[in-house]
């Protein structure tokens, strides 16, 4: 319900051709020889077939050699219901700008949702974890306070696109996509592909704070959208209508510190942290 969109791959009807997707990450996906990367995807068979095959590759799109693939493998999709499929990719060479390629090699139809590629070796070994070198560099500073997720990003371009902490917790595959605050800020340069997945959410921020030994300082929206882009007072929430925003703050306290029998304390516990973050 919170994340209803998916992509459908079907046989194109042309011999020796396949339907697929490329994802270049942020100007390329850096991978290292011999390191393991966990690929996962939620998939289903919508049209009655019992088995379809996906080809998963990390490729060097600039290569003029006979093979572009740094590593490749097949996934068998075998369920009409949404199901998580995983595989480990281990590149045979290092490349700073690889591309993740997914294509359907069989003749049926497959629906895909929540495609993910993560290093296996993350900070503290968390599956939905942080890049190890960056998190370690942050921890080495020994911060006393860790403020998250930021300032302007909490406001959103408008209230509809504000950062909502409740959408950033729970199973990562159920967290909805949101526009990034700076997607259309500068009229001379739009960033139409600038989104945030909420894959890094308040649970992950609290966990990072705890593991670094820093006091967490969560920032919440108080009913204001970006004042730089919204001069009309009606773009913001009137004082008499702030109840929902106040409740969000109270619920966050419960999420961080509440007993596992409370609504939001249970969400935290179900994510793997029954003890309060305190």
List each model region and its residues:
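Secondary-structure transition/capping motifs at alpha-helix termini
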Residues: 47-48, 64-66, 93-95, 211-212, ...
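Surface-exposed acidic, glycine-flexible loop patches that form ligand/cofactor-binding
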Residues: 28-32, 137, 207-208, 212, ...
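Catalytic-domain carbohydrate-binding cleft regions of carbohydrate-active enzymes
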Residues: 198, 202-207, 211-213, 220-259, ...
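Active-site groove signature of glycoside hydrolases
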Residues: 103-105, 113-114, 119, 149-152, ...
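Alpha-helical scaffolding within the catalytic cores
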Residues: 1-2, 98, 129-133, 199-205, ...
């Amino acid at each position: 319900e919170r994340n209803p969109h998916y992509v459908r791959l079907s046989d194109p009807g042309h011999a020796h051709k396949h339907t697929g997707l490329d994802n270049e990450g942020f100007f390329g996906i850096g991978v290292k020889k011999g390191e393991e990367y966990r690929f996962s995807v939620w998939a289903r068979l919508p049209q009655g077939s019992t088995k379809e095959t996906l080809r998963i590759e990390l490729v060097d799109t600039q290569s003029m050699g006979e093979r572009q693939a740094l590593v490749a493998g097949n996934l068998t999709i075998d369920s009409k219901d949404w199901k998580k499929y995983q595989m480990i990719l281990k590149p045979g060479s290092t490349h700073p700008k690889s591309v993740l390629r997914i294509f359907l090699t069989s003749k049926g139809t497959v629906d895909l949702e929540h495609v993910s590629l993560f290093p296996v070796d993350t900070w503290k070994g968390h599956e939905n974890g942080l890049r190890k070198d960056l998190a370690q560099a942050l921890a080495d500073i020994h911060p006393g306070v860790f403020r998250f997720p930021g300032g302007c990003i909490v406001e959103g371009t408008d209230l509809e696109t504000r950062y909502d902490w409740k959408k950033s917790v729970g199973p990562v595959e159920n967290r909805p996509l949101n526009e990034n605050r700076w997607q259309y800020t500068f009229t001379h340069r739009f960033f139409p592909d600038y989104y945030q997945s909420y894959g890094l959410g308040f649970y992950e921020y609290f966990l990072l704070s705890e593991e670094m030994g820093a006091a967490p300082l969560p920032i919440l929206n108080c009913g204001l959208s970006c004042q730089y882009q919204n001069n009309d007072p009606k773009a913001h929430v009137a004082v008499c209508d702030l109840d929902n925003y106040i409740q969000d703050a109270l619920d966050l306290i419960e999420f961080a510190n509440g007993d596992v029998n409370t609504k939001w304390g249970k969400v935290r516990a179900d994510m793997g942290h029954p003890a309060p973050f305190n």
